[in-house]
Every structure is written in C-alpha cells, then in structure tokens.
Amino acid sequence: MVEIANAHNDLIHDAVLDYYGKKLATCSSDKTIKIFEVEGESHKLVDTLVGHEGPVWRVDWAHPKFGTILASCSYDGKVIIWKEENDRWSQIAVHAVHTASVNSVQWAPHEYGALLLAASSDGKVSVVEFKENGTATPLIFDAHAIGVNAASWAPATVEGGNNPGEAPKEVRRFVTGGADNLVKIWRYNPETQSYLVEDTLEGHSDWVRDVAWSPSVLLRSYIASVSQDRTCNIWTQEDNTGPWVKTQLTPEEFPDVLWRASWSLSGNILAISGGDNKVTLWKENLNGKWESAGEVNQ
C-alpha cells in the first residue's frame, strides 16, 4: 500500500493508478492534480497540474494506446484533458459545455475509441469523442433533472453475430446516478447517434452519490449504487436483456452516508466508502449472497 501524506493543501477527492500501476494521479479541493511515480511502496511527486478554478473531484487515465493522457473534472464546470510528452505535462483540450459542477469523468472501454463520459450538476451528461485529427465531437443531453452525481461505463460487449452473414453489433452502455434518487441505464443507438434511457431503477430514498458498473465480462452484469440514504444496492442483469434485480447489502453495516463504490479489476470484489471514514469490501458467495470481505486498513 502506498501512503501519500501532505501532498495537497486541502481534501483529496480521488486517487487513481494508471494502467500499469506505475503512475498515481490525485486531485483535491486545492484546485490541483498531483502526479506521482510509484515503485513498490515508495512514491515520488513528479508534477503538479494547475488549470482548474475550483475543487477537482475526479481524475481518470485513458488507455495507454492513446498515450499518457489524464482527464479531470471540477466544480468549475470544466473537464480538462492533460497529456505527458517528454516528461512534461500540458493541457491538450478543455471540455466546457456544462453550466455547473462536473462531478464525474470516465474514459470508455478503449474498444470504442477515445470517448469520455462526464456527469454534471446541471442535470446533463456529455459524451465527447476525441478523433485522431484533433477534433472533438460532444453529445450532451438531459439525464437527471436535479443533477447527475456519477456515471460509469459498462465493459465492452457485442451482441448478435450468431447467424451466417450476421456481424456482431457493438453494445455501448453506461449507468448514471442522480439527485432525483434514480439510477438510469443508457444505451447508444447507432442509427440516431444518440444515447437513450434503457432502464430506470428505483431503489434509493435520497441522492445517489456513486454508481459503478463491474468490469467483469461475464454474461451477468453487475452495477453498484450507493446513496445519501446509507444504502448500497447491487443490481444484476442476465445476458444484457433481462430485468434488473436489486439486492441490498446488509443495511446495519453502514452507519453513515455512502460516497463511493469501486470494483476490483476482476469485477468480483466491491469496495465501498462512506462518512464513517471506513472502506469495506464485499464479495458474492457461491450461493449468490453478498457478504463482507473485510475492511481496508487505513
């Protein structure tokens, strides 16, 4: 475990390792992003990225096939794309289509290209496609009327292609969580070149603070949603087409607001953090029941 002490002058909101686990990006209410090189349990600060005018909520690394690229989102309503070349970091794009805080940012599975998903307190979600010629094409649309707190891509999947002469079709989906207490599943329609609501999931009685789609590419899909109401729901769907089934984790385990949910790389362990300053781990047993798998020692 790498411990970063006194790196920022205010609260740290996110910390993400790159694809290889060699670089760590952190972001803070001090309006900066810090880049560290990580080796074993040691780390070295290599750069401080300055460009946002408000607290920076989240950061996300692009797949290395696109280069050493990082996206950040902030209370200032902007998403900034940063790139490292020759050991120097610089801004290469600013995505400023939102009119309020951008609360979540995530790159799509690399199979879809350089697609970036952003969620904002203005009630809208945007998906930006960055093309090789340097242009960017944004789609922006209403998602949750009171505000969107989080968004998460589904892993890359295809459907069809089972019959002779039939090509498999790419399935692009993501999930959003909002201040309207709802979780929504979105699916890309290539004919209209737009994202449409596929399902609306009701299961929380207060703001949905985070959503996380498991990266597992099994036939069953898993989504975790955590809320201001102190609950975590696991939503499951069989084979991309069936109804979503809700399982609520043991409620007495969570004495305070839940802020974040994060899956392991294999998609079988879920980490949840909340207002009690604990990170708890959860795993599905062979009987399909979710049980505690311990805590992360701080």
Swiss-Prot record:
Q: How does it sit in the membrane?
A: Peripheral membrane protein
Which molecular function term from Gene Ontology is one that the record holds?
structural molecule activity
The protein's superkingdom reads Eukaryota
* Signal peptide feature range: none
GO BP terms: namely: COPII-coated vesicle budding; ERAD pathway; mRNA transport; nuclear pore localization; positive regulation of DNA-templated transcription; positive regulation of ER to Golgi vesicle-mediated transport; positive regulation of protein exit from endoplasmic reticulum; positive regulation of TORC1 signaling
Q: Does the keyword Transmembrane helix apply?
A: no
Task: List GO terms (cellular component aspect).
Answer: COPII vesicle coat; endoplasmic reticulum membrane; nuclear pore outer ring; Seh1-associated complex
Which PANTHER family did the record assign? NUCLEAR PORE COMPLEX PROTEIN SEC13 / SEH1 FAMILY MEMBER, PROTEIN SEC13 HOMOLOG
Stated name of the protein = Protein transport protein SEC13-1
Organism field: Candida glabrata (strain ATCC 2001 / BCRC 20586 / JCM 3761 / NBRC 0622 / NRRL Y-65 / CBS 138)
What are the leading ranks of the lineage? Eukaryota, Fungi, Dikarya, Ascomycota, Saccharomycotina
